[in-house]
From Swiss-Prot:
The protein's role, per its UniProt record: Catalyzes the ATP- and formate-dependent formylation of 5-aminoimidazole-4-carboxamide-1-beta-d-ribofuranosyl 5'-monophosphate (AICAR) to 5-formaminoimidazole-4-carboxamide-1-beta-d-ribofuranosyl 5'-monophosphate (FAICAR) in the absence of folates.
Binding of Mg(2+), residues: 268, 281
InterPro entries for this protein: ATP-grasp (IPR011761), ATP_grasp_subdomain_1 (IPR013815), IMP_biosynth_PurP (IPR023656), IMP_biosynth_PurP_C (IPR009720), IMP_biosynth_PurP_N (IPR010672), PreATP-grasp_dom_sf (IPR016185)
Protein name as it appears in the record: 5-formaminoimidazole-4-carboxamide-1-(beta)-D-ribofuranosyl 5'-monophosphate synthetase
Cofactor requirements of the protein: Mg(2+); Mn(2+)
Originating species: Pyrobaculum calidifontis (strain DSM 21063 / JCM 11548 / VA1)
Pathway assigned to this chain's UniProt record: Purine metabolism; IMP biosynthesis via de novo pathway; 5-formamido-1-(5-phospho-D-ribosyl)imidazole-4-carboxamide from 5-amino-1-(5-phospho-D-ribosyl)imidazole-4-carboxamide (formate route): step 1/1
Gene3D superfamilies the UniProt entry points to: 3.40.50.20, ATP-grasp fold, A domain, ATP-grasp fold, B domain
Catalyzed reactions: 5-amino-1-(5-phospho-beta-D-ribosyl)imidazole-4-carboxamide + formate + ATP = 5-formamido-1-(5-phospho-D-ribosyl)imidazole-4-carboxamide + ADP + phosphate
Presence of keyword Metal-binding: yes
Amino acid sequence: MSAALKRYDLDKLAVATVASHTALQILRGAKRYGFRTIAVAQRNADFYRQFSFIDEVWTADFSNFRHVAEKLVEKNALFIPHGSYVEYVGWRQALEAPVPTLGCRELLRWEADQYKKMELLAAAGIPTPRYYKRAEEAEGPVIVKLFGAKGGRGYFVAKNREELAKRIKAVEGDYIIQEYVFGVPAYYHYFASPVYNRVEIFGMDIRYETNVDGRTFGWVEPTFVVVGNLPLVLRESLLPVVHKYGVDFAKAVREKVSCELAGPYCLESIIRDDMTIVVFEFSGRIVAGTNVYMGVGSPYSVLYFDEPMDMGERIAHEIKEAAARGILEKLFT
């Protein structure tokens, strides 16, 4: 439990996040549930000030996020991490920030390392692509992925070992070489609820990526930079498997990372034509794909609450219920 959380006035809680990624969804949901809201901006602060559901917009230097976190504690703030926070602030600062942070904070360390990611998925018993540490080990077509939450930037595909050996020389920084799995992509949104003691399927999406999804006519190299997301509803026959993977992943986090999942997370997959699902990635926090149902609610939320709810509202609902039951320490680290 966060030491700061013990000192909080539960009647005056605020919800805060970095002004990017899913901030609008998170803060809109928090305001609808009666919380004060704070957006912390590195840039584009004026854009966020136009929205009445954001009570305060701060500008900050993310190179010293500890100072920001200490100010948030003074405001009784609960912090919601997302992909931009992980990328801009970095997992080391995120681990040390003294503000109460939603979810398993230690998972951010695992999320920053592609090999540890694959280790955790394997521990969950979830089917994954083969992966390689050296180009000379690779077989068949592969995708090369950089470490960190980069939204697909810098990824590339190589058709064979020879092409890979040539192109890998230009890669700077840490990377993983994964088997390229043929099929369609699908990204699953889950919510781990300590309040209701369950893992919920909350939605799914497809990423819209350049130049893979662009009109390139074969003239440019495929790239995987994410520019947006598209909603997806799966065949119902696939839902039991998807849910099981989410439950198994939460169990693996408990056993391998020694902390409980709380709040949103995501498994990223390819579905083959034989309907098997291969998971190649996870995100241990809210993903931008949840923005596809902001304001209208996930089609799956009605299965649990009999009313539409987006992920920002789902987070706020969990916080409110946990505060009322005196179990906020199960959500925040």
